Every structure is written in C-alpha cells, then in structure tokens.
C-alpha cells in the first residue's frame, strides 16, 4: 500500500506525510495519465480501434479509485487502532459553559476532559462514525479545486523557434496544442476527476453545521490550540472570526513555526485582542501521551 502511494505521488518523505491532506492534491496528473496512456495506446490497425480509445481513461479511473479508496481505508484503520490517551499531561482549559470545535477524530475531549459531547462539534467526523459503520461522516481530503489542480499540472510553455513567419508560427502553435493524443487527454481528464473527488467539501460542511457557527453570540473568549491555519481548514476559523473578531483570542504556536500564518490571519480578520502562546504555558502537571 505505502509503496503504491510513494510510486504514484513521488517524494513521499516525512515532510510529505506531515502535511498529508494537503499533499493528497499534489498528484502529478500528466505523469500518471501519460504512463497509463503509453501502455494503453489504441491499435489503429484493428477493426475494433474505436473501442480502444477509452482504454487508458478506464485504466486511470480504476487505478486511482482503488488507490484513493485504499488511502482512506488505511487512514480509518489507523485512527481506530490509536490507543486511548493516558492522563499524564493535560491542558489547563476552561470547560464549563464552553463550546468546542475539534478537527481531532478521537474522543480526547470527551474521555480525558469529561466534556459532554453535546458541547463538541467534530467537524470532520469522530471515531464513533467508523465504529458504527458510518464512514461517510468521516471526512478526509485536500483543499484544491479544479483550477488549482490544472494550474499545478499546467503544461510547459512552447519553446518557439526564432525566425518563424506568421503562417509558420500559427502552424507550430497548432501542432504544439495538438501534441497530446485523444486517448491520453481522456486519461488526463479521468485523473483530474478522480483527484477532485478527493477534495474536502468545506463549503458543504460549513452549510451542514451552520447552527453551530451562527450561535456564537455569547462567546467572550476564543482559544485556538494546535491549529495549523492551513489553507484547507482556514474557512472554519474564518467563519468564527466573522462573528467574534472583537473578543479576546488566544492562539497556540508550536515552536514558533506558525507565526507568519497566525499574524496574517489576525490582520486579515481584524482581530485586535489576541495573545499567542506555547501550549507549554497552559500544561497541567501531568503528561498526555499516546502509546503506539
């Protein structure tokens, strides 16, 4: 499974896995489609040639559908096998009369902090969804739309020879535009569709959880812990900022690695009352750890 991921996405090192969801959208479409198209060229001399133009498209669809489904299933299995955290280190957080938005699929808030689940929104699903077979509520994906995918895989610009007449230039550009054969273009389109299928539907998620975001009027403090401010998940925080830009915000920054994104977010949404902290500043005396 891992070798298939490495082969398809290329350069799947530790850094790649650390930004797993975003990098799901980094698939080299043209490389995958080109390889499959090369192996599934239509036989122009066959009386059944017309039937083979879609072979590469079908193969790309099958290959990526299996790969992406395996990635999602493997991620589900990894979440399910996580051991429950042991209360050796917990954050000193205010839990009474608080609301919680979590991107964590586990039940740490419920099990370790004793928070009632009715005060928690697992925005991308909870481990319970997997345990009872409702994996459709368990959301994983990248944040790129079709334009982003196309831009990422944009073809090279034509290297136009010097001294061409207008007629020669037009012919050269037409030939350059038509250099991709039909069966390969169909394979590319299939790869784009499959990659777009793995996109996280943030707008739809926000719409289906609108009640949570519309009922924040009495909130006086916003505490943001362990959030990366990645492009893919920023819309959720932006929705909160639209209603609560005038209250006090406390945001954690791990090893000062996120400062630029945090300051950009604060400025963008006109949040003037803010404090940036390290999680070590609010740790209790015990240590939270996972046994893998």
PLM region spans:
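Acidic, metal/cofactor-coordinating or nucleic-acid-engaging core segments within structured domains
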Residues: 146-213
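Extended charged low-complexity segments that act as oligomerization/scaffolding linkers
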Residues: 1-18, 194-198, 275-292
């Amino acid at each position: 499974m891992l070798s298939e991921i490495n082969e398809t996405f290329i350069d799947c090192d530790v850094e790649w896995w650390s930004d797993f969801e975003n990098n799901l959208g980094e698939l080299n479409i043209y490389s995958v489609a080109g390889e499959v198209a090369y192996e599934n060229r239509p036989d122009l001399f066959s009386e059944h040639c017309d039937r083979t133009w879609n072979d590469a498209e079908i193969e790309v669809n099958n290959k990526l559908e299996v790969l992406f489904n395996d990635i999602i299933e493997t991620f589900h299995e990894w979440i399910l096998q996580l051991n429950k955290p042991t209360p050796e280190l917990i954050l000193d957080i205010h839990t009474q009369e608080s609301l919680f938005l979590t991107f964590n699929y586990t039940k740490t808030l419920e099990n370790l902090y004793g928070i009632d689940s009715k005060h928690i929104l697992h925005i991308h699903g909870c481990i319970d969804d997997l345990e009872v077979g409702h994996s459709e509520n368990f959301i994983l994906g990248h944040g790129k739309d079709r334009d982003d995918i196309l831009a990422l895989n944009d073809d090279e610009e034509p290297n136009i020879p010097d001294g061409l007449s207008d007629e020669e230039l037009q012919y050269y550009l037409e030939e350059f535009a038509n250099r991709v054969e039909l069966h390969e273009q169909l394979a590319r389109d299939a790869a784009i569709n499959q990659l777009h299928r793995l996109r996280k539907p943030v707008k739809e998620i926000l719409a289906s959880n609108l009640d949570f975001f519309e009922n924040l009027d009495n909130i006086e403090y916003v505490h943001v812990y362990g959030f990366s401010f990645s492009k893919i998940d920023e819309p959720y925080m932006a929705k909160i900022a639209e209603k609560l830009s005038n209250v006090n915000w406390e945001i954690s920054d791990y090893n000062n690695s996120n400062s630029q994104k945090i300051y950009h977010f604060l400025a963008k949404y006109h949040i003037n009352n803010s404090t940036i902290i390290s999680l070590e500043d609010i740790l209790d005396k015990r240590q939270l750890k996972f046994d893998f």
